[in-house]
């Protein structure tokens, strides 16, 4: 028992010893490895330092060699120039000697005089040689000193070198002025050759100062737009800065104004005097695409902003929880996406915005100081058009393009019109027929047209279902039809008059409804045919045709009598036909019945109480000025009939959807997509609360648009030139308003914000909204 225990003890001791040795050996091995690593690291650092030192030495040597070589080249250059100047001086001396010898030979007639002159010339030559030797030695000494100084000073005194050389040349000139004029010329040429380098150095900072001045000008406090109240001046400056802009601007301008003098000639020679070839929009667009593919890109961008038909929107609209189509009614979001895709677009949009808004404060000062206070040229597009014609005959083609788009008068239609039994203009005044042809050519077109139609009329059948099921019944504030339905319930008389007006605008004959149900295609074909509706109205009421034609003439100014007057007038620019008020006055004289019907239509639009009719008849001036003054009418109606305001507000809400309850509901709504930026009338209400003066200025703006100043009518009759200046001159009106009320500008900007929805707060609210689409 004991032995076994001892053996056990021994065995355990041996094992412990082995374990101890193994642990020590592992420790020593780790220490050795760490030491080796330290040695390697130190060697690596040492070698890297050596390499860095070697490269540094090489760099310093190369740099010194470069500097010395540069200095040596400069010294050689100056030595070469010095030797060249000396050689040129010797050449001039030799030439002078030859010329003096020739002159002396010609002048001396006798030998005695010749011998004396030779002696004199020898003496002079000796003197000149001595002077030359002295001047050469002085030149060498001075140039050597200059070269030494230049080498010691270095590159920083390049400009001083030119000055020293100039001083040397000037001293030589003073010494050699008496007999060496040609030598002075060569010296001057040499100095001029040296001057450009110094001048270049001095000119470099001047260019930078010019650029700095331009930066300062751009960073000036008045950044609004420098001649934005002078669109033509703005356009001219834009032309200078961006010639590409002129092409696009001219296209758009031609599209808007459509007043080529050649058209006037064609109109006179045509059999039908009412303007023939003003024509086929879509076909014209296709031809424009073929001739200028760049045009399509810009047109599509502008079209997207107006109609908001981005295909991505369509996808988002279908996936959205709220099916009311809010992204497509967000032009600002569309614009932002366009900016991201094409930053060049923003520049052109801003230029166009400046031309439209004309808000340069400097222009205001210039306008007041001008002799002619009406500022006619900038508000005289016809004069501008005439100048454009002279500068660019291509103008006509592009102008006709857009005019054809708006009026749909395809030349082929003109042929069909002449051959038709009914000469009343069937297809050319039938844009829906044009649409049907477009459907056949491009089925994609129909989808986009329907989307745009839904946005305007809010007639999505799904919306109707959602509206009925919704807890909040006021979702129809962006639904004018729902508003109309509520009005029908309150006032059945209203429905009759509204339906008449609605039929004229939308052509929704109940017979069409029957045809629509029976048609294979349920998407409403005949109700989108206003001309067919008009033809049926003609059959039912021939009186209607006469009045409709009169109203059409007032809008389009196509009275055949005007055509005769235009030919006989001394001024061929034709302003009587663009004078609808004069046209109305002539219509009154020819047909007093017309006035009654026109007043009915006017009442529907402006809510003119029949009691006003009595007041109008008793008025001293029988021309009906108050009816052409809606704001004055509204003010008088408010005083006489407070009930009037309610009806006017109802009609206003239908058009603009500005129920005050909507504002509250919008804030409480879960869907934050439409806060206040898509609600211009809510903006108006807030403006009223903050600034009651706003209403007055809004009325001023309305007068400018409609030109219904009673004084204008008097001035028009008394004016020598019958072109109707003041009434067709809204800018002159603006000038008078500015003189009377400088506060006007501020309020005009408010109105601009309402139209464009550019409140900075809206942008912040939009970004913070849960749904970031609008």
UniProtKB/Swiss-Prot annotation:
Keywords: Host cytoplasm, Malaria, Merozoite, Repeat, Secreted
Main localization of the protein described in the UniProt heading: secreted
The organism's place on the tree of life at top rank: Eukaryota
Bias (Basic and acidic residues) ranges: 117-140, 174-198, 264-276, 314-326, 364-376, 414-426, 464-476, 513-525, 613-625, 663-675, 713-725
Cellular location(s): Secreted; Cell surface; Host cytoplasm
GO cellular component, one term: cell surface
Amino acid composition bias (Polar residues), ranges on this chain: 201-228
Motif (PEXEL motif) on chain: 84-88
GBP-type repeats, residues: 226-275, 276-325, 326-375, 376-425, 426-474, 475-524, 525-574, 575-624, 625-674, 675-724, 725-774
Annotated region described as Disordered, given as residue ranges: 97-243, 256-291, 310-334, 358-383, 410-434, 458-481, 509-533, 609-632, 661-682, 709-734
Functional description taken from the UniProt entry: Involved in merozoite invasion of host erythrocytes.
Domain notes from UniProt: The PEXEL motif is involved in the protein translocation through the parasitophorous vacuole membrane and into the host erythrocyte cytoplasm.
Description of how the protein assembles with itself and partners: Interacts with host glycophorin.
Identification of the protein by name: Glycophorin-binding protein 130
Organism: Plasmodium falciparum (isolate FCR-3 / Gambia)
């Amino acid at each position: 028992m004991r032995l076994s225990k001892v053996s056990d003890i021994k065995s355990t001791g041996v094992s412990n010893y082995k374990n101890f040795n193994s642990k020590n050996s592992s420790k020593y091995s780790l220490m050795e490895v760490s030491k080796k690593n330290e040695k390697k690291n130190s060697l690596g650092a040492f070698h890297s330092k050596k390499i860095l030192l070697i490269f540094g030495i090489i760099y310093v040597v190369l740099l010194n060699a470069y500097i010395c070589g540069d200095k040596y080249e400069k010294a050689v250059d100056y030595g070469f120039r010095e030797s060249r100047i000396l050689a040129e001086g010797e050449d001039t001396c030799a030439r002078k000697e030859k010329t003096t010898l020739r002159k002396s030979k010609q002048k001396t007639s006798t030998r005695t005089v010749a011998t004396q002159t030779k002696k004199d010339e020898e003496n002079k030559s000796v003197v000149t040689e001595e002077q030359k030797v002295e001047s050469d030695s002085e030149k060498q000494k001075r140039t050597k000193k200059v070269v030494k100084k230049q080498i010691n000073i270095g590159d920083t005194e390049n400009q001083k070198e030119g000055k020293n050389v100039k001083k040397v040349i000037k001293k030589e000139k003073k010494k050699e002025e008496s007999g060496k004029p040609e030598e002075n010329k060569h010296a001057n040429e040499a100095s001029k050759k040296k001057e450009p380098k110094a001048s270049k150095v001095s000119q470099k900072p001047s260019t930078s100062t010019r650029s700095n001045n331009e930066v300062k000008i751009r960073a000036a406090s008045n950044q609004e737009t420098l001649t934005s109240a002078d669109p033509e001046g703005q356009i001219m400056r834009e032309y200078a800065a961006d010639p590409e802009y002129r092409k696009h601007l001219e296209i758009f301008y031609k599209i808007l104004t459509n007043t080529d003098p050649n058209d006037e000639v064609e109109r006179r020679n045509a059999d039908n005097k009412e303007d023939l070839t003003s024509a086929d929009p879509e076909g014209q667009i296709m031809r424009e695409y073929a001739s200028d593919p760049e045009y399509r890109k810009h047109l599509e961008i502008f079209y997207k902003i107006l109609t908001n038909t981005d295909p991505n929107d369509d996808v988002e609209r279908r996936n959205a929880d709220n099916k009311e189509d809010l992204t497509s009614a967000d032009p600002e979001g569309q614009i932002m996406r366009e900016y991201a895709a094409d930053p060049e677009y923003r520049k052109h949009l801003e230029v166009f915005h400046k031309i439209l808004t004309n808000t340069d404060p400097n222009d205001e000062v210039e306008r007041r100081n001008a002799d002619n206070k009406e500022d006619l040229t900038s508000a005289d597009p016809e004069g501008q058009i005439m100048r454009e014609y002279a500068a660019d005959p291509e103008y006509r083609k592009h102008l006709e393009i857009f005019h054809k788009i708006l009026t749909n008068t395809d030349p082929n239609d003109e042929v069909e019109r002449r051959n038709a039994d009914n000469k009343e203009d069937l297809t050319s005044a039938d844009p829906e027929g044009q649409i049907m042809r477009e459907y056949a050519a491009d089925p994609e077109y129909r989808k986009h047209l329907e989307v745009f139609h839904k946005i305007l009329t809010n007639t999505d059948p799904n919306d109707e279902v959602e509206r009925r099921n919704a807890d909040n019944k006021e979702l129809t504030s962006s639904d004018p039809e729902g508003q109309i339905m509520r009005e029908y319930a309150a006032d059945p008389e209203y429905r009759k008059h509204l339906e008449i007006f609605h039929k004229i605008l939308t052509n929704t004959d109940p017979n069409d409804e029957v045809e629509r149900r029976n048609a294979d295609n349920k998407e409403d074909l005949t109700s989108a045919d206003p001309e067919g509706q008009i033809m049926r109205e003609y059959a039912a009421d021939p009186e209607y045709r006469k009045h409709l034609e009169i109203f059409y003439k007032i809008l389009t100014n196509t009275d055949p009598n005007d055509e005769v007057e235009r030919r006989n007038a001394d001024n061929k620019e034709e302003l009587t036909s663009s004078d609808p008020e004069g046209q109305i006055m002539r219509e009154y004289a020819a047909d007093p019945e017309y006035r009654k019907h026109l007043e009915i239509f006017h009442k529907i639009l402006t809510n003119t109480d029949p009691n006003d009719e009595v007041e109008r008849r008793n008025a001293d001036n029988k021309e009906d000025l108050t009816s052409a003054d809606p704001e004055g009418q509204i003010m008088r109606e408010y005083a006489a009939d407070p009930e009037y305001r309610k009806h006017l507000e109802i009609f206003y809400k239908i058009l603009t959807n500005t129920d005050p309850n909507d504002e509250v509901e919008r804030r409480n709504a879960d869907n934050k997509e439409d806060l206040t930026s898509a609600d211009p009338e809510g903006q108006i209400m807030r403006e009223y609360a903050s600034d009651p003066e706003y209403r007055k200025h809004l009325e001023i703006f309305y007068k400018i648009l409609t030109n219904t100043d009673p004084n204008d009518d008097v001035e028009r009759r008394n004016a020598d030139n019958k072109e109707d200046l003041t009434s067709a001159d809204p800018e002159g009106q603006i000038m008078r308003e500015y003189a009377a009320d400088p506060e006007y500008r501020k309020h005009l900007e408010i109105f601009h914000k309402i139209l464009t929805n550019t409140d900075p707060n809206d942008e912040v609210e939009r970004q913070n909204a849960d749904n970031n689409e609008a």
